[in-house]
A protein has these predicted regions:
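Bacterial N-terminal signal peptides that target proteins for export
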Residues: 1-8
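Cysteine-centered motifs
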Residues: 7, 13-14
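N-terminal signal peptide c-region/cleavage motif recognized by signal peptidases
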Residues: 15-19
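Flexible, solvent-exposed loop/hinge segments and secondary-structure transition points
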Residues: 21-166
Length: 166
């Protein structure tokens, strides 16, 4: 009986997956805390305010789901949707919306992407990366031109750079 139990235990040990094998079917990811996402959004909004622009800012997670959405008092009503869609686009494609705007011009191989719902081919959306990982994206709408929107979004990322580098 003792020999049978010992053999059964040995067989179970050999049949059980190793810890490294069990992890092959999953992965771990980190997310911005609501506080960190809010810090980025506020920094982007403040950067645009200092430049004299009334804007909306969206921060989304890696799946493109909104974490923070801010609109300055006099930013146009449309800026909320535009910022949210820019952030979704940057997170979804893991690249800046300015890059996508250039790559999806008429006649380019990727021009069909412009027909996707929520796809926003205008500068101002940036991917939030830290420690080799994508956390999501931040986007701004309402400044005069995508370049100005992008500068404000970059200020938002800069404000949280220390918190997301590890």
């Amino acid at each position: 009986m003792k020999l049978t139990a010992a053999c059964a235990a040995a067989a179970l040990c050999c049949a059980a997956p190793l810890p490294g094998q069990a992890q092959d079917g999953t992965f771990a990811s980190r997310s911005l805390t609501p506080e960190t996402a809010l810090t980025a959004a506020r920094a982007a909004l403040d950067s645009c305010r200092k430049a004299g622009y009334q804007v909306a800012v969206a921060v989304v997670d890696r799946a493109g789901l909104v974490q923070v959405l801010l609109r300055d008092r006099f930013a146009g009503a449309h800026t909320l949707d535009v910022a949210s869609n820019k952030a979704w686009t940057a997170a979804s494609f893991r690249t800046s919306t300015a890059t996508l705007a250039a790559e999806t011009q008429a006649g380019r191989p990727m021009s069909g992407l412009r027909a996707l719902p929520r796809f926003m081919a205008a500068g101002g959306g940036l991917v939030i990366k830290g420690g080799g990982q994508v956390f999501g994206a931040i986007a701004v709408s309402g400044a005069p031109g995508g370049d100005a929107d992008e500068r404000c979004a970059a200020a938002g990322i800069q404000a949280i750079a220390d918190a997301i580098e590890f």
